[in-house]
Design a protein with these regions (language model features):
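Short, compositionally biased P/S/T/A/G/V-rich stretches that sit at domain boundaries
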Residues: 139-177, 182-186
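A broadly tuned, weak detector of single residues within folded domains
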Residues: 72, 120, 174-175
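Generic short alpha-helical hydrophobic face used as a protein-protein interaction/packing hotspot
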Residues: 83, 131-132, 185
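Predominantly extracellular beta-rich ligand-binding scaffolds that present long acidic/polar faces
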Residues: 1-115
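C-terminal accessory segments
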Residues: 95-156
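Generic ordered-secondary-structure signal
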Residues: 18-21, 42, 58, 63, ...
Length: 187
């Protein structure tokens, strides 16, 4: 699951989840990957606004604001929390994990931004360059600005065709047809 804005939550403790990757997402609801048979799940560079339950995986470069943080047999590195969520305290001060951050300090906020754009980082916050260095690259924490980061409104940085006008029919024997194509640059 990559570059999604998720409002309905993910997971179920009844199902075994193996080799899942959740990267560069914004979660406004719960993440429940608490089946004890889960294995090798990667949760990296996300923004979480609700509870997290994760068994057997890797959790890094995330920004969390939730009521509970429950992990078992999970490597927890370079995450930031808004306030001090229950269960996150044992990880604070180790492997780059920090707590007691605030939305106002980390994020741009809703004013002048879209629903998903409000979670972009403010310059100079601990989340900027706060991710785990891999292959000589130190990403930001959160969903944006990581390698292959979250894309606002899901629109990639490539030209988009937003209108196409084609005649319903052309006269028999006509060698050409006029078509109108409208594009927009999303860079």
């Amino acid at each position: 699951v990559n570059k999604c804005y998720i409002t309905g939550g993910i997971g179920n403790s009844s199902f075994v989840m193996q080799d899942w990757e959740l990267r560069n997402n914004i979660f406004t609801s719960n993440l429940d990957m608490s089946n004890t048979s889960n294995s090798n799940n990667l949760v990296r560079n996300n923004v979480f606004r609700s509870s997290i339950n994760l068994y057997n995986g890797y959790f890094a470069n995330n920004i969390i604001q939730n009521t509970t943080f429950t992990v078992v047999n999970v490597t927890v590195k370079n995450n930031l929390s808004i306030g001090a969520p229950a269960g996150f305290t044992p990880y604070v001060g180790t492997f780059g994990n920090l707590n007691n951050q605030t939305d106002a300090v980390l994020f741009q906020g809703l004013t002048g931004n879209s629903t998903d754009g409000q979670w972009r980082l403010k310059p100079g916050t601990p989340a900027v360059g706060g991710g785990l260095t891999v292959g000589g690259i130190t990403p930001d924490c959160g969903a944006f600005n990581a390698q292959d980061g979250y894309v606002l409104s899901g629109i990639p940085n490539i030209p988009t065709i937003y209108e196409l006008t084609v005649p319903a029919s052309i006269p028999a024997g006509t060698a050409t047809m006029n078509v109108t194509l409208s594009t927009r640059n999303n860079n």
